[in-house]
Amino acid sequence: MPETNRLSEPTEWIDLEFVERQRTPEFAIQVGIQLYLAGLSLSNTKQYLERLGVKRSRTAIHDWVRKADLQPDCDVSPNQIAVDETVIRVNGQRHWLYAAVDAETNQFLHVRLFQTRTTQLTVLFLRELREKQQLSDTTFLIDDAAHLKAALDRLGLRFRVSRHGNRNSVERVFREVKRRTSSFSNTFSNARLPTVDSWLKAFAVWSNRCQS
């Protein structure tokens, strides 16, 4: 089980302040979150914890990830940020995943899931990113989508249309996200937008850990 190889890594990136009772040992919560985000299914994560003497349901493990409220962040101001969106399906329905990725490091800076794609929602996504990042010296790398250009223009942010080179960083991370979300309908019962959005943010944090 190669995913377990990362269990020796520091876990300071997992804030356990959400743990209200000591019914579950903190180490078990950390292990469960790590394994699930690393690629194990909820069922396999549950089985691994049982071998450690901790019996918890799949729902409990999923709730740990949700309650941890992991959010991607970055201390540096990237020179170039690749921004794009892609369709993922949850319970058979189309949703739009927006992502901003440091074009040099492939690290997620911000992710957000929407039920549709509009210029106004793109503006909202970029405003949320601007609250987290200093963007005055940043150039955004985008495709030729009209809503992306309109939103960046509206916010006075510098951008360049680019279909190759560093903009491909966002395509690479999208491939992994799609691989993981393809099983959502089999993993979550009646998955809702906030549920999937919180998982995506947690996955972004995990992905950034793998890049560092």
Predicted feature descriptions by range:
Residues 1-37, 62-63, 76, 82:
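Basic, short loop/linker segments at the boundary and entry of helix-turn-helix/winged-helix-like folds
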Residues 111-135:
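Active-site beta-loop-alpha junctions of metal-dependent nucleic acid enzymes
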Residues 174-212:
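Charged alpha-helix within mobile-element recombinases
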Residues 36, 91-118:
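Short conserved beta-strand segments at catalytic cores or DNA/RNA-binding microdomains
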Residues 136-148:
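Acidic/histidine-rich, metal-coordinating catalytic segments
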Residues 77-90, 99-101:
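Two-metal-ion RNase H-like nuclease active-site motif
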Residues 54-69:
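Major-groove recognition helix of helix-turn-helix-like DNA-binding domains
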